[in-house]
Amino acid sequence: MKGNSLKKYVLVPFIASLLVFVVYGLLMAQPKAGPASSAVLATADGESPGVRVEVTELKRVSGGTVNLKFVMINDSEKKVDFGYSFVDRSHDVVDFNSIGGVHLIDAAGKKKYFVVRDSEKKCVCSQGLKDLHPKGRMNLWAKFPAPPDNVEKISVVIPHFMPMDDVPIGR
């Protein structure tokens, strides 16, 4: 009788609690649907075969600025060396291994927007970049002064890639 009491009052509730805990844990561990992946606003091929960029965000943000986010994709068999390849030549020393040469062009307003610079004249953009290896991807970003509010589309120019015209500026 004592064995039945143990089963009835201790083991059964313990096993039931354990089962509930395990089932709850399994349910919580199921992958959740995350936010939809970023839409590609524009894409351009590079001078090197198999290398391209995809603009995933161009958006007005606080402080009268615009954030540009893009992905560089290397589907080739050769590495992409950043070095001075993507710099603004007027800032070579501080732009080394950055994308400081990326710019925006408002053709209608005849205005070119350069990457924002900090007090040390460094670009407010992806810096300290390493080589992009074959079959690799790299997320990059840069901050620009915002064009006037009536400018809804702009050209994105990334050195060594075809210009991407009429890229929509989000809010």
Feature map (PLM): residue ranges:
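Signal peptide processing junction and immediate N-terminal pro/mature segment
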Residues: 25-33
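The feature marks short-to-medium sequence segments in extracytoplasmic or secretory-pathway proteins
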Residues: 62, 73-129
